[in-house]
Amino acid sequence: MTSAAVGRTLIEIDGAGSAIVFVHGLGGTSNSFQMLLGALGGFRCVRPDLPGSGRSPRPFQALTMELFVATIWDVVQKVGGGPTHLVGHSLGTLVCLLLAAQQPEWVKSLTLFGPIAEPSDPARQRLRDRAREARQDGMIGIADAASSGGVSSASSSANALLAPFVRESHMRQDPEGFAQSCEALATAEGADLRFLRCPTLIVTGDEDAVAPPSAAQAIADKVKGAKVKVLEHCGHWTPFERPRDCARLLSEHVRANETA
């Protein structure tokens, strides 16, 4: 593994071969996909921390979805080396969808874990409330809620380290960066899915309250040929909760579409 930077965006690069660029969600970092890398031999796995998250500092301008998309587009061009597989979780799936719609010739495939096409009005308000909480009280309450409510009880029982890992991922976020990321998602508009041309795999949990199976299927219905996999007894943090299943599904998908 090597660390690098594209501008002020810090990235980790593992392996060699065709590029897979991973985009984490709210409260996540490049580490959100660490458990999937073992199944991806023969690929170059590129994992950035989005601006204001993880080790990437906040820029001088406010965080927006447009900035996130531009950041990943910059990474794809400068590190990807050509058409690239995109993988996202939660907020990161919307970044991937937007980029794939804008630059279809650059995207070999999409893999979306816990996808968000566009926040509902109630979700937008919850995101604004979460931003306010981060600024006023820091990350403790948000981290507790994410680690207790974001994962399924079965996943927590099977892996005692899961909830603490999700909690720590949130606790290490810069509160202002997290708040601005929430606001960016709260004002986001969805991608025009008619412009998607790449093979698309959507993976969600049957207990995912953020991206329930019905929402995942609604996205798939608008993307020609998209496939949906629903993992049983799984919440929103799919790569954490079902790493073996997610690694297998991702590996099969990118390998099947490597010549796309």
Predicted regions and their residues:
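Alpha/beta-hydrolase fold catalytic core
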Residues: 1-20, 41-44, 80-82, 172, ...
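Gly/Ala-rich beta-loop-alpha elbow adjacent to hydrolase catalytic centers
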Residues: 88, 92, 96
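Conserved HGGG/HGGXW glycine-rich cap/lid loop of the alpha/beta-hydrolase fold
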Residues: 9-57
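Conserved alpha/beta-hydrolase catalytic His-Asp/Glu region
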Residues: 118-125, 137-195
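Short beta-strand/loop motif that positions the catalytic acidic residue
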Residues: 196, 202-204, 208
